[in-house]
Each structure stands twice: as C-alpha cells, then as structure tokens.
Amino acid sequence: MKISKTQLTPAKCALDLGDGSERGLYVNQDYILRKLGRPHRGINIMYCYYPFDKEWPQRVSEACKDTNISFAWDYPYDDYFPYRGGIDGNHDGEPFTCMRDIRKHGQEVVLTLTCDPNVTDEQIEAIAKDLVPYGRMMLRLNHEATGDWFSFTKRASYKQVADFYVRFQRILKKIAPNVSMILCIGGLEPGSDKIEKEAEFAEAVKETDIWSVDQYLSLNWGWPYEVALKDNSKHKRSNTKEIYDGTKAAYKRFREINGGVNKQMLISEFNADGDVTGPFDQIATVKEFCEYIKADSENWLSGFTFYQFRDDGRLGLEITDPNNSDVGVEQPILGAYKEIMNDDFFKQGIEVKGDAELPVTLRWGSSEDSEGIAIDVDLEKNPVFAEAYFEGSLADANLMMEINGQWFYKAPGVKFVDFMPAFFDGKISEPKTVKLNIFAPPATGENDPSQGEDWLTNYYYEIKELPRLRFEFEPVM
C-alpha cells in the first residue's frame, strides 16, 4: 500500500463546540463524533472556582436547592460544575476526565472558568500546574467580564476584575506556557467608538493571547424561569448584520488598543435561541451569519464556538429529553450545522507532504498542526464492506482517522473499526482512489514529559505497521 506524510492545517475560520454548562450536561466525544461526523478544533467546557464560599465545593444549585431563585445567576456563586483541581485537587474527577476525553479525540480543550477574583497567587499557581499536561489548550477566564450577572463581578470592581485577569495571565505564562488565555468582554459601547469598560480592561486587552466576545443572535435570558412570549421582556432578537458588524468593530478597537498589533479574535459563544425564534428561523439566522463570515475578504474572525451540543433549553444541536438526561433530541439546527462543518471554509485542511516509509513517527501538536500518514485505498465502486483491523503494536494505538470526508476514532485496545458510515451518504459512483488519513493524539489525553523538550506542545507516536484493510464491493452471498 502506498503511504504518504500528511499535515493538518487550520481552517479559515475554526469551529469549536460548547459541551456542558449550567444549561446541560457534558456529552462524551464518541457520541458527538458519531452524530456530527468530524471533530472540532476545540471543545468548550464550563466550570467555576469559588473556594472561599461555605457551599464550596458543591454545585451551588444543589447546595441551595431549597432557596427561592427567580434568575439563573441569583445563587451565591455561578451554577457551573465545580472545578475540582487546584490545591489538594482531585485529578481523577472533573474537569480532567472531560479534558482527557476531548484530547484523545483530537481536539483542544477550551476551559471556561469563572473564578473568585480574591484567590491567592498560590491558588492560581496550582491551577496553572493542573493545566500543564494538556497541550495547546485555551483558558477563558471570567468571561463576559463587563457584564453584571456572574458572581465574580459582584465581589470586585471592574478594575479589580481586569487586574485579576492580568495577574492570572502572568502567573499562568510562567508555569503553563502551553495555555493561551481568552479575554471575553463586551463589544463597543452603544453610540461610542470605545469598548465597554475600556479604561478598566485596556491592560488586559494588551496582555491576553486571544480576544473574544459572546454573541447571541437571539436569546431568552429569563430561561428557565420565564417562557419567552410576545408580551414579556426577558428575551431579545437582534439584526444579524448588525451583530456581525458590531463584532468586527470590537475586533478593530481591540487591535487599536493593542497598538495596531493583531491577535486572534473569537466569538466564544454563538447561536440563535430557539426559545425566541423557533427551530426554523434559528437555522436561517445562524446560516446568514456564517455567510457574512465567508464573504468578508478581511478574514478577521479566527473562529467561533457554537453553544452548545445538548441544551436543557433550545440552545442546543440537541435538547435534553426531560424524561432522561442521557438522551438528546436532535433539532433541525443539527443538520444545518453539519453543513457548516463540512464547508471547506470552516474545516481544517489535510495536506500531503510526500511519500513515507515505515516506521513513521507521527506528531500531534493540535487539531490545526499535526503530522500523520495517509494510505491510498483503491475503490472499484461504493463498497459493501469497509473495515480496518488493528493488530500487533497497533492494538494499543490511539488514532483519529478520516476517509471520504468522515472521521473515526480508535481507542487503545480497540482492534476493529467499521468505515462504512463514510459511504452511506457519500457514495462512490465510479472507480476512485481515496485516502485513509491517520493521526495519533495522546493516548491518555495528556502529553508525555519524557518525550523531549517540546513535550508541552507536542506528542509523538511511532507507527511500525499498517492496519489490515478489508474493502469489498459485493455482498458475501
């Protein structure tokens, strides 16, 4: 079989996906990959850290379940799942189980963490040490920081919140330089050319690695205590073009504050709320926004995070079955989102880099920068059987594979993968050679410090043999 060296390259606009928040539980990456057919650049998970509170480390909605609450953010601290790392933390629990799951499936961790701005340098250092093994991850600390709903904004002034961000960033960079920090704040003040709380957050804009805003084309922020109706007011729907233009204007102002020097710009939460629009206008407005991104020759937006995979309300590709939280009910937006994912503008590239010979050392840097191999597979027509068997040293390999536009995961210990789902919709009508692309993310989800000086940002795996392939084009009988 002919094999080639390959390289993963960034999308023009990366797609990340929210997976778990105050509005829904984390869904494992095997399920999401099977539903969507390809991985994301990153997966955003949301946690909180309020170690001085008497309710800590319980989830606050469970600790205060008998309290009369009429707004999602009225609890003593934010109702995300507790971050159980830090000083004397437990790395066998959350969020680390989720982080390892995400990375094993060839995606980057995007950790959103709301944090008491009064935590000590020692506590920040402990969190930074937690994040060292997880490669090129991103940390979105105290997002929507110019708002007034999260608990951290009620415990400090905006200047103190901004100064805390800078303090956290500087400590993190000394201990975990593999982690990029995302500053997520408001856009331009209405009627102004300055961003919200610009004086307070100017230094943070300069210090951070990545700029970000959150944008909902429509939103029922009264959920789950108020149903959005025509005669009540805790919901909104915005003009899609105005949201796009306003986000771009915020990016340009961030760049001006930074002395004209560019940085990545993200939308860290993006969707239209089906509670306001219903399922069909939700599709129309999301697709409209994506068309604005594609049509803009300035290519200023580095990526966005679709919020989220499974939601207890109507902000999900699936909504949670109220009878069983392990069950998701697919929404029409899921099919539309798959079309966006499969648009070349929004998916990473795979470039061929010349011939290869076994053994080959594969390098996993990130979903936008990794080296793999491709096996040429000659197809007479659409197969009836398309299989791979992983024997010998390959049995324990952790692999992400792509064929005919669809991705597959092989966990350590798995010896068989069925590729036929790649040919259910993408049928082959004439003889064709396709490539089976193989990459090797970290088998444990963590990088290995024994692998060399660049272990913080790269993971290596040597392939000594190829899988045994079975492609047949007629039924057995």
Residues covered by each model-derived region:
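Substrate-binding cleft of secreted/luminal carbohydrate-active enzymes
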Residues: 2-32, 45-50, 138, 263-359, ...
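N-terminal carbohydrate-binding/catalytic regions of secreted carbohydrate-active enzymes
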Residues: 16-133, 285, 292-298, 309-312, ...
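Aromatic- and acid-rich polysaccharide-binding/catalytic face
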Residues: 45-48, 111, 198-241, 307-312
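Glycoside hydrolase catalytic-domain groove-lining segments
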Residues: 78, 216-276
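Active-site groove signature of glycoside hydrolases
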Residues: 128-158, 181-188
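Aromatic-lined carbohydrate-recognition surfaces of secreted/lumenal glycan-active proteins
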Residues: 169-196, 259-275, 301-311
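A short beta-strand element within beta-rich, extracytoplasmic domains
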Residues: 358-360, 364-399, 434-438
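Beta-strand-rich ligand-recognition modules
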Residues: 396-464
